[in-house]
Amino acid sequence: MSRAVLQPFEEYQKARISFSQSIAELASRPQNIEALHAAGVMALLRPLLLDSVPSIQQSAALAIGRLANYSEELAESVVQNDIITQLIYSLAKPNRFFKKAACYVFKSVAKHSADLADDVVKSGALEPLVQCLDEFDPSVKEAAAWALGYISKHNSTLAQQVVEARAVDSLILCLQEPEILLKRAAAQTLSYIAQHNEQLAQPVAENGLDTITFFLSYNDTQLKRNICQLLGNITKHSPDLATQVMAKINNPQKLLNCLKDSDDIVKKNAAFCICEIVNKSPENAQAIVSAGGPGIIVDFITNIKGDPRLYGILSLGFISAFKDDLAMAVIQAKAINQLRDALQNEPHQHIKSAACYALGHVGRHSTKHSKEVSDANVLSLMLYYYMDPNSSDDLKLKAKNALKKIIDNCSNLSSLEPLLHVAPKNILKHILQQYIKYLKGNTTEMKNFAQNGGLQKLQEIKNKVEPKLQTLIGEINGYYPAEIVKYYSPDYAADLLNKIGGGSGSDNK
């Protein structure tokens, strides 16, 4: 074939290469995307996916992926132009660079919404994506793992289809590969699958916990983030899964050490996992306590602020809820002051709610537990948030429940006195019941109660409260001589002055 004949073909090929590469480069900068879209670039790139030159196919796919990644509108354009089907057809070719770019397109489309992810699945992409997990090239495996992850994350139906495509075993094998980027992608995708429900978490746990838990001690921050989140997403669904995770971790110290990590997200995800573990059974809570967990958790909530504290605070509450000795371990770890700090100083109401929940469970077991909590002056704070009209409904509920739990075991009457003057009727009932329980026959407490204004307060409110509360006040009054009760009554001074006035008038006559 003469040079004159070949030259136009060579120039045409060079032009296609230049065009596809230039568009891929332009699409890497967000400020160019709208102009490219307006120029109809998607329709021009589509035929290049079937080009005979592999580098052109690859550049075209990369450009389409970058365009789809930019917006949902462009991702929908990829679906509407039937580009996904074309990519799936081309995946049968052995070009690893094109396979990586095609997986990137699937990820870029699927990430925007469940509907677009479903379009990718309905186009038949799952089987070739799972096959890409078995490719020799780790970058192809990584791209496929991310695409499967972005499909799985939206809902349980899509994640179930990924599981049914036999992706889980291949993803677990990817975790065992030496490439760190591939490990990260596999761990994140398994986490997306496991997050939805127990049925999806179970195959991940059955086949992968030995491998997954090994990486708790791995020296890579992003991987540890993903692993802690993955373990939490497995654990959260049931006590059985939590037990499986604990059995495979073997030494809880490995997980607790993640709370000491230099990276805040590792710490947050580890706290999430621990929170889900201790919530599921007293045995799990005991294992964490035996490994020194309360002290490490307290250090965690001391040194971190904002939302990550939530999981640590809830963990202390869950541990304390099960048994009195576990609650005492939380007290001995000096948790109460940090819980009080969260209640008083955290700006987020859901964290205040968690602090109320934890303090309520710490203080509910016995008079000793209650005293430790009430001595920290948290009862007044809880009552304040319960009565504050700006508090959320959840904060009010948690504060009310915690107050009742702690007060019902409180023998430290001096800590109840400040509440007596401001407590609403439903809390006042619990306070009065404690006075009835501990004042009777205790002359020291009776004197203190009278001298500190408590007895006088009861006389002031006696006629303003409902009959049930009047009965309780009457029972407390019965512990004192009648003249003492009369002395602290609101009308006593007026009655006395009337007597004086009456006596003076008689003398003048």
Spans of features found by a protein language model:
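N-terminal "cap/leader" segments of large eukaryotic alpha-helical scaffolds
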Residues: 1-35, 47, 485-509
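Residue-level signal for cytosolic alpha-helical hairpin/rod architecture
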Residues: 1-3, 20, 30, 42, ...
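Buried hydrophobic core positions in alpha-solenoid tandem helical repeats
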Residues: 2-5, 44-46, 86-88, 128-130, ...
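Short, hydrophobic/charged alpha-helical patches characteristic of ARM/HEAT alpha-solenoid repeats
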Residues: 7-10, 14, 32-39, 56, ...
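Alpha-solenoid helical repeat architecture
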Residues: 8-11, 49-52, 91-94, 133-136, ...
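Alpha-helical solenoid repeat architecture
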Residues: 17-30, 44-47, 58-70, 89, ...
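Short helix-loop boundary/capping segments at the starts of domains
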Residues: 25-38, 42, 47-54, 66-73, ...
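Alpha-solenoid helical-repeat scaffold
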Residues: 331, 349, 356, 362-509
